[in-house]
UniProtKB/Swiss-Prot annotation:
Expressed in ovaries and activated eggs (at protein level). Expression is over all the embryo at all stages, no local accumulation is observed. Changing residue 81 to T: Increases the amount of synaptic boutons and microtubule loops when expressed presynaptically. The modification Phosphotyrosine is found at residue 214. The gene is sgg. Disruption phenotype: Mutants display an overdeveloped neuromuscular junction (NMJ), with the number of boutons greatly increased. This is Protein kinase shaggy. The modification Phosphoserine is found at residues 213, 217.
Amino acid sequence: MSGRPRTSSFAEGNKQSPSLVLGGVKTCSRDGSKITTVVATPGQGTDRVQEVSYTDTKVIGNGSFGVVFQAKLCDTGELVAIKKVLQDRRFKNRELQIMRKLEHCNIVKLLYFFYSSGEKRDEVFLNLVLEYIPETVYKVARQYAKTKQTIPINFIRLYMYQLFRSLAYIHSLGICHRDIKPQNLLLDPETAVLKLCDFGSAKQLLHGEPNVSYICSRYYRAPELIFGAINYTTKIDVWSAGCVLAELLLGQPIFPGDSGVDQLVEVIKVLGTPTREQIREMNPNYTEFKFPQIKSHPWQKVFRIRTPTEAINLVSLLLEYTPSARITPLKACAHPFFDELRMEGNHTLPNGRDMPPLFNFTEHELSIQPSLVPQLLPKHLQNASGPGGNRPSAGGAASIAASGSTSVSSTGSGASVEGSAQPQSQGTAAAAGSGSGGATAGTGGASAGGPGSGNNSSSGGASGAPSAVAAGGANAAVAGGAGGGGGAGAATAAATATGAIGATNAGGANVTDS
C-alpha cells in the first residue's frame, strides 16, 4: 500500500478530540538494552497519566492500519503488544473509545495508551498498549491443515464458546465488532483462553443511523453486507462467527470468494436462493431482482460424515439469510453443542492445567437474557446452596466463579450426540514447523494487530497445547478452499443471479469513516 497509513480506526463522528497528551518519548540504554519511557494513560479507570517504561521492542506486524510491536514492561516483565496507528487530531479515535469501555475475560485488555510524534510535522500516532497473547485461532488451524487434520472437536467447542461469550458481552453494549475472523481470535495455547481482538472496525450501532456496508473480511461477510445494506445490526457478527465455526469443522473456509459476487455465489450454493422476504430483510432494494432458483444443499452433506450433529445444527442457526432469525450469541452459548463443557468432571486440559474460566458470569452477562440462565449454568453450579453458592439470586445473579467443568481431550470426544458417535480426532498436534512467511491471498489481511490478524506474534507451541505453532507466521486471510456443496451448474446460475450486485462490496475492511 502506497502513501501514508490510513488514520486510525474509523474516526468518531465529527467530535473534536481533546488535547492530546504528548509527553515525549524518552529512550536510554541499560545493560545493552534500549529502554523507552512514555507518558501513558491507563486503559481503564483513572485518566491520571503515568510514566511507563518498556524494552525489548520488535515489530510483529504491520498493515494499512499501522504497526504492531511486541515489548516488555520494565516494572513487571509482562509482555505487551503496542499497536501504533496514525491519529487524526480532529477526531476521537473510535477504537480507543470502545476499548476503554470493555472489560471481559474473553476480550483483549487495553493496559495503557499514549501518543507519540511522527517524523512529519504535526503527525501524531496513537499507541494502544495491549496484553500480549501468543497465537491466533487462524495459525493453530493452519498448523493442523498442514497435516490434513482439523482442530479436535473439543477444542473447537472450547474456542467457539468463548467467542460467543465475548460477542454476547459487546452486543449487549450495542457494539458490533464488524471483523470477526480466525485472525482476530487470540489464543493462549497453554491455557486455551481465547480473546477477541482488533476493534479497529468496531462501532456502536444506533437505530436509524446508517453504517458503511463495505466492512468485514470477505469470507466472513454477512449476505446483507454483500447486498449493500447500511442499516444492519450486530447479527453480522453472528454470521461471521458461524463462518468461523464452519471453517474449523471443515478445515477450510465455507464461503470462499474472490469478490462480493463470488462470495454470494458460494452462499447460494449452500443455502439456496434467498426468498423474496429474506432479500427484503437483507436489503429491500433488491426484492424485484429475479434470482434463478437454486435449492439449498443439506447441511449434513456440507460437512464430513462424522461431524457432530449438534455442531451442524448450531451452524445452521447461525448462517441464516434473515438477520433477525440468527441465534443470539448468548443463546449460542446455551446450545447443546456446548453441553459437554457444562458436564461435571475433571477440570483439566490435556497439559494438566485448569480449564479456562467459562462460567464466571457477571450480573450484567446473566441479565442479557435471564431466561437462558438455567441452560447456561452447569447443574452442579445451579444446585450450589448457601451464602457461598454460585447460584443466581432472585434479584439478579451471583458471580458464577467457576472455571471449566469438564476436561478437554485433544483426541476429541467419544460421547454420543443424538444417537450417533462423535469422532475420535486423529492425533493431537501439528508439527512445530519452521517457516516464517505463511501469508496467503484472500482478503488482503494485514499481519498481527490490525484488520488482518491480532496483536500476536507466534511463539511456538507449548506443551499440552492443541497445536505447536510455527514461529513468526504472518497472519493473512485464509486462501482458497472449496466451500460446501452446491450442485453442478450452481455456480454459473448463482453468478447470473448476482450480476446486479456486481461491483458492490468486494470485501475488505476499514476503509471509510462510518
